[in-house]
């Protein structure tokens, strides 16, 4: 029997041969890229790769080796494609996304829409983001109404909640972004501090019914667990809950909303800081109908769909990983009328002008069934 050192020496020799053959193969792959550049052929030929994988894996002398050979060559082919995408980008063959590059966004006299009523957290995010330009704003009843206002030209920008640090994503707004095809041009993160609000003179012992947005109720779950006798009611946002409590004028009704909302609607603060997570925050996106980005933009949001098969998500994300792109966030949403199939949303740190992202997006556009760039904005 050979000792371990002898076996390792043999493996080292084989590994050097593999490296030499790999580099030889990649050189030929580069020549393939040159041919495809000249002829306009696509890099990814799925039928050809599937046929080749089947042929190569059949050469294995056991089920284990056949599986391993297939996996090995899947990786080799994937790297080969990435090299070809890179060469095409270097040759200036890159279909740029339909986005206009601007020096800066102009918010002067902009019409801005938000969902809810006066005092909603969305309005607070709007004011923090737009500052002095926030004067020409108005509210609508639903998030869809806000997106419709952009589509119809009644508003230039909309502000939508997209994610909360405690309750997770606002799934409806992810779906609306895909449906309407609007563009994210900014984001605003605000700290969420919930308070229990009642009509003037109400006491904690009077309360039997609590109103708020479903996510706000979730974010105060531990506090509400201590008051199991209270009936919980969901409304479209926290400000609407405060407005209802004020209009009903009944001492047994309370709202979960912000202190600012209490001031707007003339309610008393019965308890403050009732959210479970004291670092609770919500991320809002700023949306417009024009596909634009600025030179300072440093975050991209995309969504994509892929084949419903083993390893599909890994292969799609590998385009970002291989190009050294740092992912901030990944989320999935079920595809309508296609049970157990999903659309993926990914945020990553980069600008559309970066060659690395151009390589990654080229690969994704060829190897996914659908790719949509939701926006490139400053975070």
Regions found by a protein language model. Name each.
Residues 1-379:
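Domain-level signature for soluble enzymes in the chorismate/prephenate branch of the shikimate pathway
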